A protein has these predicted regions:
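Structured alpha/beta or helical-core interaction and ligand-binding surfaces enriched in interleaved
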Residues: 1-156
Length: 156
């Protein structure tokens, strides 16, 4: 799939709704009482490309369970529409050329299978959830023993 085709299958959520979705996600799935949450995530720092945080939300996920990537395919066969967003990082810290295909604070709504087919167009650390806000799946940029480090939280 080419980027243009992928973009034709996604809905970019408006800014106000993006903020609401992110805040609801954080309230549901992120341990905001962790001692490092405030300095790493809540307090944004000034960079040449705007205000960004330093850490990764997945470091503060409540009740994380490690899952393998095939689990995402299983879920995609059952759940059709999802949201996805990524960490708000600076180009000063992400040194991969042409990394951002969408805005840093963007939230997308799309078919789960389409997301999996087009994930090369997304940042490496992605947070996937649906309207129920009862579960999340996370793909990180890390790997453990040659397997991508993926997490789930909630009931799915």
């Amino acid at each position: 799939m080419e980027l243009k085709e992928f973009k034709s299958h996604v809905k970019i959520i408006d800014r106000e709704s993006c903020d609401t979705l992110r805040n609801n996600y954080i309230n549901c799935f992120v341990n905001t009482t962790h001692s490092l949450y405030v300095p790493q995530i809540q307090i944004k720092h000034k960079f040449v490309d705007g205000l960004c945080y330093l850490g990764y939300l997945w470091d503060y996920i409540k009740n994380p369970i490690i899952v393998e990537e095939p689990f995402f395919d299983e879920v995609a066969s059952k759940i059709k529409t999802v949201y996805v967003f990524w960490d708000i990082h600076s180009c000063e810290r992400i040194l991969i050329k042409n990394y951002w295909k969408f805005g840093k604070e963007t939230v997308l709504k799309l078919n789960f299978q389409t997301l999996l087919e087009g994930e090369d167009f997304l940042p490496e650390d992605i947070y996937i959830f649906d309207d129920s806000m009862t579960w999340t799946l996370i793909k990180t940029h890390e790997d453990i023993q040659g397997k991508r480090y993926c997490l789930k939280s909630g009931d799915i």
